[in-house]
From Swiss-Prot:
CDD domains with a match to the protein in the record: Lumazine_synthase-I (cd09209)
Recorded GO MF terms: 6,7-dimethyl-8-ribityllumazine synthase activity
Name this polypeptide is given: 6,7-dimethyl-8-ribityllumazine synthase
Function: Catalyzes the formation of 6,7-dimethyl-8-ribityllumazine by condensation of 5-amino-6-(D-ribitylamino)uracil with 3,4-dihydroxy-2-butanone 4-phosphate. This is the penultimate step in the biosynthesis of riboflavin.
């Protein structure tokens, strides 16, 4: 039985990171974690392009454009949606998740979902580099692994 796995070596790979500007005090930390992880695993900063969009809802469109460009081995999507007192949270979270998943399936490029969907600011802070780790860094690891898994197939 063959066991196909992806390694965590980013040498020679190119990445795009699409980050929402809304809640940027959290998203800056997610972005820093992602870039740091990519570099620690062999990517060079000149092979990492970052694009800022107004909010999480706009991420899938830009991720699709980046994936279709053929310039990137993977696209990492970062943002934070914090529940408020209206149903807006539910609509945004659902559409962003569907949109990012659709882009991956349509393009065949790994598109990583690093959009925090939290009940509170405290939960978001925990996931951006404190006691729950940095989800931007985790997405970067996932991107590296997925690129290498797809290359091994």
């Amino acid at each position: 039985m063959a066991k196909i796995t992806g390694n965590l070596v980013a040498t020679g790979l190119k990445f795009s990171i699409v980050t929402a500007r809304f809640n940027d005090f959290i998203n800056d930390k997610l972005l820093s974690g992602a870039v740091d992880t990519l570099v620690r695993h062999g990517a060079v900063e000149s092979d990492i392009d970052t694009v800022w969009v107004p909010g999480a809802f706009e991420i899938p469109l830009v991720a699709k454009k980046m994936a279709e460009s053929g310039k990137y081995d993977a696209v990492i999507c970062l943002g934070t949606v914090i529940r408020g007192s209206t149903t807006h949270y539910d609509y945004v979270c659902n559409e962003v998740a569907k949109g990012i998943g659709a882009v991956a399936l349509q393009t065949g490029v790994p598109i990583m979902f690093g959009v925090l969907t939290t009940e509170s600011i405290e939960q978001a802070i925990e996931r951006a580099g404190t006691k729950a780790g940095n989800k931007g860094a985790e997405c970067a690891l996932g991107a590296i692994e997925m690129v290498n898994v797809l290359k091994a197939l």
